């Protein structure tokens, strides 16, 4: 990520030496135990989707905490791993909204400008939210703040109470916010199913003269 636009803009937004603090944190936790995703995938969302190309943001909470699931992209898992329940529901809603998608690795979304960002970028094995409140939130809030300053439209898709709290960071009238309940089985029937976030995001992008995302790719 070094030498990227992300690095330059985030360095301006964050307190001095914050990248050093993140590296020290990662040195410590990866040394002490099993952490997901693999260290070389921690910044995958920013590497797969350069700042200049971001058109949609889908905000998650933290990575999957089981073996071989997390790949540094919110909600996504490799094709070789069964889709977790939230991802099953995301693809179910996509099927109702725009049609069936035959695979569940979301890397092709990231390659089209969909930033798949978790608020925490690491998690200890088997401990959901185990790194919450330790280092990541100022960093990922800074990601949202620099995107808020973009001149081109960005659609922020916020699922669930945690993600929806971040909408206060999105103040630029050029951008759109689409929010609903979380796709988790605990809440999907309370407003996620039927919310049509994918077609709504595309409708906004097209209305602003931007190409739509091919969500089925």
Curated annotation (Swiss-Prot):
InterPro entries listed in its UniProt record: UDG_fam1 (IPR002043), Ura-DNA_Glyclase_AS (IPR018085), Uracil-DNA_glycosylase-like (IPR005122), Uracil-DNA_glycosylase-like_sf (IPR036895)
Catalytic center residues: 62
Transmembrane segments: none
Family annotation (SMART domains): UDG, UreE_C
Sorted UniProt keywords: Cytoplasm, DNA damage, DNA repair, Hydrolase
Catalytic reactions on record: Hydrolyzes single-stranded DNA or mismatched double-stranded DNA and polynucleotides, releasing free uracil
Pfam families, per the entry: UDG
Function: Excises uracil residues from the DNA which can arise as a result of misincorporation of dUMP residues by DNA polymerase or due to deamination of cytosine.
Protein name: Uracil-DNA glycosylase
Native species: Streptococcus thermophilus (strain ATCC BAA-491 / LMD-9)
Gene: ung
């Amino acid at each position: 990520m070094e030498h990227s636009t992300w690095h330059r803009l985030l360095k301006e937004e964050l307190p001095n030496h914050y990248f050093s603090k993140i590296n020290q944190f990662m040195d410590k936790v990866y040394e002490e135990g099993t952490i997901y995703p693999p260290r070389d995938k921690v910044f995958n969302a920013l590497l797969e989707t350069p700042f200049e190309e971001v058109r949609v943001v889908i905000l998650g909470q933290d990575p999957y905490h089981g073996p071989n699931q997390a790949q540094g992209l919110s909600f996504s898992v490799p094709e070789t791993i069964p889709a977790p329940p939230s991802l099953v529901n995301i693809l179910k809603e996509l099927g109702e909204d725009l049609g069936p998608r035959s695979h569940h690795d979301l890397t092709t979304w990231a390659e089209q400008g969909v930033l798949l960002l978790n608020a925490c970028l690491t998690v200890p094995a088997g401990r959901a939210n185990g790194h919450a409140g330790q280092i990541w939130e100022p960093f990922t809030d800074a990601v949202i703040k620099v995107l808020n300053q973009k001149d081109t439209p960005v659609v922020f898709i916020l699922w669930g109470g945690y993600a929806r709290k971040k909408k206060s960071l999105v103040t630029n009238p050029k951008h759109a916010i689409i929010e609903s309940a979380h796709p988790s089985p605990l809440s999907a029937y309370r407003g996620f199913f039927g919310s049509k976030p994918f077609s709504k995001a595309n409708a906004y992008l097209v209305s602003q003269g931007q190409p739509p995302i091919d969500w089925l790719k």
